[in-house]
């Protein structure tokens, strides 16, 4: 008998599942017989419990298990027979009217939608390009020098000088101070510290502290007012004005290493050759620029695909992705050391919009890949792994690391598929190239 699939909406369907009671009962009896061989009950040796007693105690549980298994099997059979592309998990409910000699259930579920992708020639994408020159290399070297800064006591002669004749604290100096804060001449909790270090100009301290410390010499003090906002977390001082006195204990000036052979060696250039060092920095910057431009243009391509595509999104898939995002959020909290992160009450509704976009995009990409043969080829995957491995000291070990784990390899395969999609769309869309600086590129990719 043909199965009747009811259309309940754009994607929602319903089908009736009928299970002969005698078939179900035979399976229940068989399982109880098997259970009787292992079940333990007081007063009986294992395997010697009468089947009738086992049935009395476990019949309900076994019946539920058998029905669940049989319903699932029958639904799978119907799905294949009717060529149903089921999205998510179906829900099963007993029918109000049961046929004689059979169990009847309604299976309600969603199917995958038809995906209509519009004309790719109408898609618009802005592609950023950037050039790496001496200015970008010099800027990177400046950052690397600052990462290797050494501080020396200002005014004391040393290997690198004394920091100049002016011994007052300047921006860039690391200072060590004592400070005392009072409200109405009474010290308050948290308002006092000794030997407190910070670097002037980094912005870690309140502006009032920075201003007070600037220009002081060792042993000098300065008093200033600090008004706490009404919503300050410390209730005892919220909305009040405190008088702070800061006393300079130590001033250390920053010494940046010279860009010489030793500096090059510290960056991994064994012979200290400065030309090689600049060449490697340029290669690294070009790889980073390529990665950032690819990421930005990929996001633009995905946005363009969503704009020209028409499809209904199965609610079941959105709900599944919401739960995945909730679990990812909990894992992130756990990695940050948040207590009881795995049980954090994170509402799935927070991720509704994000989940809908992810699911919709996944369906569009799957259709585009299938229709245009954009699957990842083994040689493409290997080429990407090799490219990624170049930035590590032992590329061969990185390659082995990828190919030793199917999940890592699957992630790289997904990346290649996305790259194939991006290249395919760029070959057909309206693409505008825009030259941007490396700094602007870094800022744009951080916001993407």
Curated annotation (Swiss-Prot):
Keywords: Cell cycle, Cell division, Chaperone, Cytoplasm, Isomerase, Rotamase. It is found in: Cytoplasm. The keyword Nucleotidyltransferase does not apply. Pfam families: FKBP_C, Trigger_C, Trigger_N. InterPro entries: PPIase_dom_sf (IPR046357), PPIase_FKBP_dom (IPR001179), Trig_fac (IPR005215), Trigger_fac_C (IPR008880), Trigger_fac_C_sf (IPR037041), Trigger_fac_ribosome-bd_bac (IPR008881), Trigger_fac_ribosome-bd_sf (IPR036611), Trigger_fact/SurA_dom_sf (IPR027304). Residues 172-257 form the PPIase FKBP-type domain. GO terms for cellular component: cytoplasm. SUPFAM superfamilies: FKBP-like, Triger factor/SurA peptide-binding domain-like, Trigger factor ribosome-binding domain. One of its GO terms (molecular function) is protein folding chaperone. One of its GO terms (biological process) is 'de novo' cotranslational protein folding. It is an enzyme of class 5 (isomerase). Its EC number is 5.2.1.8. It catalyses: [protein]-peptidylproline (omega=180) = [protein]-peptidylproline (omega=0). Involved in protein export. Acts as a chaperone by maintaining the newly synthesized protein in an open conformation. Functions as a peptidyl-prolyl cis-trans isomerase. Belongs to the FKBP-type PPIase family. Tig subfamily. Consists of 3 domains; the N-terminus binds the ribosome, the middle domain has PPIase activity, while the C-terminus has intrinsic chaperone activity on its own. This is Trigger factor. The lineage of its organism: Bacteria, Pseudomonadati, Pseudomonadota, Betaproteobacteria, Burkholderiales. The gene is tig.
């Amino acid at each position: 008998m043909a199965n009747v699939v009811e259309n309940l909406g754009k994607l929602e369907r319903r089908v009736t599942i009928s299970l002969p009671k005698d078939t179900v009962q035979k399976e229940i009896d068989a399982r109880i017989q098997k259970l009787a061989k292992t079940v333990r009950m007081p007063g009986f040796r294992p395997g010697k419990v009468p089947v009738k007693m086992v049935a009395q105690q476990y019949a309900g549980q076994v019946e539920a298990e058998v029905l669940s298994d049989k319903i699932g099997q029958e639904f799978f059979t119907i799905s294949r027979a009717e060529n149903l592309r089921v999205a998510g998990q179906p829900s099963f409910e007993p029918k109000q009217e049961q046929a004689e000699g059979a169990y009847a259930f309604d299976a309600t579920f969603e199917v995958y939608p038809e995906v209509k992708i519009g004309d790719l020639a109408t898609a618009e994408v802005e592609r950023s390009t950037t050039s790496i020159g001496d200015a970008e290399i010099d800027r990177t070297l400046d950052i690397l020098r600052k990462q290797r800064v050494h501080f020396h006591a200002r005014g004391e002669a040393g290997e690198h000088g004394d920091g100049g004749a002016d011994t007052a604290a300047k921006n860039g100096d690391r200072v060590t101070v004592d400070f005392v804060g009072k409200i109405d001449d009474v010290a308050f909790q948290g308002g006092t510290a000794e030997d407190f270090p910070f670097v002037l100009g980094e912005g870690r301290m309140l502006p009032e502290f920075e201003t007070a410390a600037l220009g002081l010499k060792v042993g000098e003090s300065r008093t200033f007012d600090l008004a706490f906002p009404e919503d300050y977390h410390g209730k005892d001082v919220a909305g009040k004005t405190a008088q702070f006195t800061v006393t300079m204990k130590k001033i250390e000036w920053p010494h940046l290493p010279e860009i010489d052979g030793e500096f090059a060696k510290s960056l991994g250039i064994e012979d200290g050759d400065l030309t090689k060092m600049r060449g490697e920095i340029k290669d690294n910057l070009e790889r980073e620029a390529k990665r950032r431009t690819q990421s930005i243009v990929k996001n633009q391509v995905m946005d363009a695909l969503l704009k020209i595509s028409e499809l209904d999104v199965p609610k079941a898939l959105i709900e599944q992705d919401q739960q995945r995002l909730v679990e990812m959020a909990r894992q992130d909290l756990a990695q940050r050391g948040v207590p009881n992160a795995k049980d954090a009450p994170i509402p799935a509704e927070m991720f509704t919009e994000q989940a809908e976009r992810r699911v919709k995009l996944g369906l569009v990409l799957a259709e585009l890949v299938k229709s245009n043969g954009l699957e990842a080829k083994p040689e493409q995957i290997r080429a990407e792994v090799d490219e990624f491995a170049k930035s590590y000291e032992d590329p061969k070990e990185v390659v082995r690391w990828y190919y030793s784990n199917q999940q890592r390899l699957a992630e790289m395969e997904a990346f290649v598929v996305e790259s194939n999609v991006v290249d395919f769309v760029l070959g057909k869309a309206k693409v505008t190239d825009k030259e941007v600086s490396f700094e602007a590129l870094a800022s744009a990719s951080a916001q993407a």
